[in-house]
């Protein structure tokens, strides 16, 4: 005779699922409140590549113990001025702990308001977030949009942080390192893959294989700039993946070397284009030029030489290196003895080398150039002194090389800043 299994399986938990969720909610609430100054929220409305729906927005959040929250931002959604909003928040149980902003907050709810975008759906952003990772005393908390599934990272702010000053700081850094007026593309290296990048000022970085086709191969990668421990960080919405084992999502700015380096692998980086190559590529068309004047930054020897050249004219307007026809010329623009604008061109051969540019003076263009030289011997001397090798470095930052510094390879005390036009 077989005995029946009358005993019941022992309950693995002392409390019900609802009770456990409620306790977890209390713990997570306390952890959000534990940051005295609040948190940096890296908010992305959707995973779209559309400019406003897919780009990132830095929102600062201070969760108070009275169940109110102060949110702040300074971006295109606030008309690029500082804006604060105050509302209520709580952590609710919904198949797991969910952070909800349950009364209207103009800082966050504008991303879900259908009136804010011409599609009639708004930016389709979330205002409820599944709490994915909320470690005790953690520097970071990871959330996930309940509807759109975009990941939102919270970073603890140091005590005493002023919201308005913090937002102004990172905005100024972003616009300074990636100005809308930047004249050159930049470079991103992850693993053995190198990419050209552009449009970084918008926060919707365009990326294509270095040397590839910018029109057909560009992909879009939204990112945000934040700051912690006195350093600026650039973090993409999604990691840049080269293969299953090689990726990088976040980079920290290395001020000494003017580049961003990967936080997981310092061999990964973002930096400006090579100054030598950028200087040379301007001569690929006649659309742009490198120009300088007597008021440009320069060494004492350069200033003395240009002062002598200027003394031979009624006024020296500017000098430039540019493509004219099939030749690179140094154009000298001046005011003649009749106070008329005039210019003369002198052909230079330009050679790009790994460590610099070599300029070699050839001859004047047409008789006008030849006729000016006897009347202004200082100009003839200047042409010869510019006929040498120069190292080329960024005037201020490789991320925006609207100015470059040419330094004589044979004399580091002979240099001049030239400007991109």
Named regions from a protein language model:
Residues 2-4:
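C-terminal motif of bacterial Sec signal peptides marking the signal peptidase cleavage site
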Residues 6-98, 134-136, 142, 148-150, ...:
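Acidic/polar, low-complexity intrinsically disordered N-terminal segments immediately downstream
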Residues 34-42, 66-70, 96-99, 139-142, ...:
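Short, hydrophobic/aromatic-rich segments at coil-to-beta transitions
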Residues 57-63, 87-90, 126-133, 221-223, ...:
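Hydrophobic/aromatic beta-strand elements that line small-molecule binding cavities or substrate pockets
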Residues 80-85, 109-115, 152-155, 272-273, ...:
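A short, polar/proline- and glycine-enriched secondary-structure boundary/capping micro-motif
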Residues 97-115:
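Short solvent-exposed strand/turn elements
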Residues 117-138:
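A recognition module on extended beta-rich or small alphabeta surfaces enriched in W/G with H and D/E
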Residues 157-405, 412-421:
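Preference for solvent-exposed, low-hydrophobicity sequence contexts
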